[in-house]
Amino acid sequence: MTVTSLPPKSAARVRVRVNRLVLYTVLVAVTGLFLGPFGWLVLAGLKSPEELAASPVHWLPDTIQWHNFADAFHLIDFLGYARNSLVIALIYATLVTLSSAWVGFGFARLNAPGKKILFGILLGSMMLPQLITLFPTYLIFAKLGMVDTYWPWVLWGLSAAPYLVFLFRQFFAGLPRELEEAAIIDGAGYIQIFWRIFLPQSWPVLSASFIIAFTWTWGDYIAPQLLLSTDHSTLAVAVMTTYVNGAGAPVANLQAAASVMYVVPILLIFLVAQRGFVAGMSTSGLK
Amino acid sequence: MPSHAGAPPSRRRFLALSAGGAVAGAAALSGCAMQVSSGVSGSGETVTLMINPDDLTPELIKQAQKDLGVKIRTVKYDITKLIAMLTNGNPPDLVRGIGAVDAAYFAARDVAEELDPYFARSSILRLDDLDPVNDLWRYDGRTQGKGPRYGMAKDFSQDSMYWYNTALFDKTGVDYPSETEPVTYEEWLDNAERLVQRKNGQTTVFGGSYNGLGKAILLTSLTAAAGGNLFTDDFSQVDFSSPEARKALGWYIDYCRVRVGPSIIDPDPNTWDGPTYQANRMAMSNCGYWLGGLINTAPKLAEVSRLAPAPVFEGGPRISTCQGGTGLWMPRKARNKDAAWRVFEWFFGEAPAKARASGGWGIPTLKSLRSLMPAQEEHQKQVLKVQEAELKHFSVASFTPYAKWEGLESIFNQIAPAAMRGDMSVDTLARRLNSAMNEQLKRGKEQVG
């Protein structure tokens, strides 16, 4: 019997193909794992309550219940709540992106006594769970007469967010010092340097920051639930609490359909801005 | 810091832009928040209700605006928010609460308004028309069920009763329970074991679910059914070691151990019985009359659904408690009490009460509204007959004012799973529950004073 062996080039090509096949298989499996819950949510939104509770599990609906989406949309003022969510998310994302960039610039490019300690405190505040501050937060805003208004999101936006400050700080610290020095020689002050030189350079981080902040607010349940009345509340609160039957128990298929519609805006924003988002995360030194 | 002053116009421009952005964002909202279309607008007094979305539909709120000339503002019920509002001195005017477990808790802390003067002058909520279930909202400083009224139940069920699916009984050849004579808890569990269906180690049909409206109130109710009281006379301690409480606890642990129904160690992914029962995957469901609201919407399910009397313990009294009695109470510091009372009367005696009564989601709490309960279909007549007979056995199982039921339930959920899995004896469990719960009750009593 004659043993034939592949020429070295062909063997290498086969090895590359096999490696690629293994890689793609793993990637597809991981993607499936991550998309699984969302896929299940979509399927749940297309089933009847009986099918949703069936055992053995009905993976695919016998009859697709498209009307669940229409019902979920009409059962509550979906657009009204979505508008409220959008307004809050835009206010907060815009303001917090600007304020965090400003603070991040300070930490990256300016020197002052206690800067390191202040930065440590700032980072330390990221470890503080939101639940701890829930009660005093309500009391403060109630004393200021800001309960059931959107002013808390304006104030939170103007106060910068530690994680975003860190993101900007990392990015600004990586920009060449020559840029700053040239501007100083030309007579620019630090406000001008920030506004005219550093900020225009930071579009990737700006878009990453905006997306992150927008997603935080769009998905936040606790703050709107605590501070807003039902009529002024957001889609996150409405989706979580409004699809109930006469006994207050959740109607899971309508809730699932509403949840799918609820995440669509976030997915669209991410799809449109994903290049900037990825670039922002990679150029900030955070991966 | 190196000092390089910026050019004044740029600084101003930057500050103007930053401030402008902030102000524009806020001003765009008119300094306020945007409202979804609840249909509530216009002038008049405003009453704030802390309720759940299913308590009042936007249409009913709109109707209230028209009928009462009162603007109703709703906030979602949330205990953290309620405590924060009470602490801040600006509570809602009316708050949702579970009569069985909340009434004494808030009354003992002196944050609830006594409503007797309001009831005395009401022509809509007459005292002789109130169902005895409303006594859950009475508290005399020591015992629930006596003394001033602090609230009222919107509807109720006798929550130890259970529904059963005749098709699943037929399939396994188990006899239907009597419509008039209760089974014993032991018989109920035997039936559940015969009715459960499993395939490849998975439970495809639960034999029966028996979890009450919460573990703390369920065990209070089960102990009463065994002829005892879970709490000491002054409600400052639990005693799971008494023969009656031990019997009740032992039965519930047996129920969990044999895995015939959902429990902490075998949770139902649907989180409550409704969808599972609706999918013909639960032969018996420990829900009271209120589950009829769901069953009535599914004609095929209604045909095979029957309501049965609350089980009894061998040698125990025949009682049938209400573990909920959810309704509204008025905080003592409510700002708009008279307008709130008008809404209270409307909610419990007018359009919303009538809508609830005819919906089948609970028994009306005004006797005069009983005639509105669904009784057109044959199965509805059967359900009503059983329910009316059961009302004779209604009783109040008093709950402690010194702890929130969620706190006691949390302790139970932490300790009990070991006993449910057979890793701890019921006696040990009883001792550990006594120790942990009494510690919490002690702290609660210190707060009340």
Range-by-range predicted roles:
Chain B
Residues M1-V111, R121-L127, P177, E314-G316, ...:
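Conserved N-terminal structural module of periplasmic/extracytoplasmic solute-binding proteins
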Residues D102-D159, A308:
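Hinge/lid segment of periplasmic solute-binding proteins
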Residues V75-A84, P182-E187, I264-Q278:
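Short helix-initiation/N-cap motifs at beta->coil->alpha
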Residues G141-D155, S160, E186-V238, M282:
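Extracytoplasmic/periplasmic solute-binding protein
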Residues Q144, A308-P309, S358-Q414, A418, ...:
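Long, aromatic- and glycine/proline-rich binding clefts that accommodate carbohydrate-like moieties
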Residues D116-D131, S178-E181, K199-N200, T204-S209, ...:
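Short, solvent-exposed loop/beta-turn-alpha elements that line the ligand-binding surface or hinge
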Residues D190-R194, D234-D266, A310:
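Glycine-centered hinge/linker elements that transmit conformational signals in sensory
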Residues K66, T87, G250, D254-V260, ...:
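Extracytoplasmic/periplasmic substrate-recognition and gating elements
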